[in-house]
Amino acid sequence: MFCIQCEQTIQTPAVKGCSFAQGMCGKTAEVSDLQDVLVYSLQGVSYWATQAHRYGIINDEINQWAPKAFFSTLTNVNFDPERILQLTSQAAQFKAQLKDQVLTASSLANSPLSEVPAVAEFELPENAQAILAFAPQVAVNRGKESVHEDVIGLRLLCLYGLKGAAAYMEHARVLEQTSNDIYAEYHEIMAWLGTDPEDLGELLDCSMRIGLMNYKVMEMLDHGETATFGHPVPTAVNVKPVKGKCILVSGHDLHDLEKILQQTEGKGINVYTNGEMLPAHGYPELNKYPHLVGNYGSAWQNQQKEFANFPGAIVMTSNCLLNPNVGQYADRLFTRSIVGWPGVAHIEGDDFSAVIESALAQPGFQHDEIEHMITVGFGRNALMNAAPAVIDQVKQGNIKHFFLVGGCDGDKAERSYYTDFTEAAPEDTLILTLACGKFRFNKNTFGDINGIPRLLDVGQCNDAYSAIQLALALAQEFDCGINELPLTLVLSWFEQKAIVILLTLFALGVKGIYTGPTAPAFLTPNLIAIIQEKFDMRSIGNVQDDLNTILAA
């Protein structure tokens, strides 16, 4: 195996990347190798989908399936080798189908194809053993013996960025938001990466193209969520348990949460959100259910302890999943969509009766704990409605600076930086936050500035789109560029969604972003230097030193 896509990958002076029997995330070498073959197969599918598009052939089923399958290889999503093999087999079938259609269309048009790349001609071996034997040939760092390490690094930046965008495409698709133009662009990029490009300039340009494409995807996802569930409104959420039977919903999928809420009505079951599902409470069409009683737990890395202590059924709708056998709760855990763990029950479709049965069989919480309320729901509409009041406070000198502090959380001790940063931020500053990094500080008290809360929870990781809209509105009001605003982004990364959001911000021209806790292992020192120079990206350091630098600018 060789996997270097997440922040927790092995990174020592001698070794970079997970290349032993098991990755740091818990996936086996077998699963990692099968995922490499799946990605290579999907690049072949994208080649033929791109050619098909040129002949006016658009296959909605394949367009919608391909990013979803790619999503299954994102960190902490699918650990089940059988499921990965099924996806790879499906990719081979779709590739053959598209190839036949393209060759027929090409013959009818008397326009033979130019040279077909190896990734498009690849034939999947007949059995799992043969597939695993083939896997080293399509490892994500293939060609490392003859290709400069900077080329490998930029290929991976593009691949992982596109993987993050594919995840958001799937989240949007679940809410019936699709775009043939975006699918076409996705396939073009995926197919091109399958040809193992070597030009550094083209690869860097490709990363920016991915960032801009993802901006459109986030816009599409924002529309899907708000059209379906209403615009988020500031809402108080209890983060302590209440007495009763219970179901915990983790991941990102609001559609699944809605179905669970509908199917548990009148059954005496309380529903809790976990992790990135916390922002669900701000959506009117979800918050209207009285048995959506609160949020349980914190960020993904704590789930083995928190899930073990949860006395009900648990549904994992997307990333991030950890080994459920550690806390011995695998028998009451259910996976959805592209999520998988060997031996864990998987739910197809929208019937959650098995989850409800499991919840009723568990003891549930035996008593109410004292309420602790936090506020969520400062999405795009709420932020834009508050913009005039915020602008007025800026003009009066009561708000001196804005910080966006958020992103993925993780285990490393260095991540305490983000807690310390928010606590040290002066009282005349506003802090926007999003994604699971917020759990480092979202239960703390920050007060307000003349009625405007100093901590504004914007939502999930994809709700970076909302923060961008506020920044654009402020820039327009003050007649300046985004980089001239008293606004600083302080981001934490862990996996590929965070990578593509960073690419989106770069592509939109946002500079001076602070990132941490460590640099991606797949980026060489030279590439990091290039990115720092081109985008003025900064690494987090000492909290007070960083604050002094930011506020003195």
From Swiss-Prot:
- Which positions bind [2Fe-2S] cluster? C3, C6, C18, C25
Listed name of the protein = Hydroxylamine reductase
Q: Which domain of life is it from?
A: Bacteria
UniProt subcellular location: Cytoplasm
On cofactor binding, the record's note says:
Binds 1 [2Fe-2S] cluster. Binds 1 hybrid [4Fe-2O-2S] cluster.
| Enzyme Commission no | 1.7.99.1
What is the native source organism of this protein?
Vibrio vulnificus (strain YJ016)
What general EC class does the enzyme of this chain belong to? oxidoreductase
* GO BP term (any one): response to hydrogen peroxide
> Hey, which family's this protein in?
Belongs to the HCP family.
Modified positions (Cysteine persulfide) in chain numbering: C408
Q: Which UniProt keywords apply?
A: 2Fe-2S, Cytoplasm, Iron, Iron-sulfur, Metal-binding, Oxidoreductase
The catalysed reaction is: A + NH4(+) + H2O = hydroxylamine + AH2 + H(+)
Q: Which coenzyme or cofactor does it need?
A: [2Fe-2S] cluster; hybrid [4Fe-2O-2S] cluster
Function as written in the Swiss-Prot or TrEMBL entry: Catalyzes the reduction of hydroxylamine to form NH(3) and H(2)O.
Q: Where does hybrid [4Fe-2O-2S] cluster bind?
A: H252, E276, C320, C408, C436, C461, E495, K497
Q: Name one GO molecular function term.
A: 2 iron, 2 sulfur cluster binding
Which is an annotated Pfam family here?
Prismane
| A cellular component annotation (GO) from this entry | cytoplasm
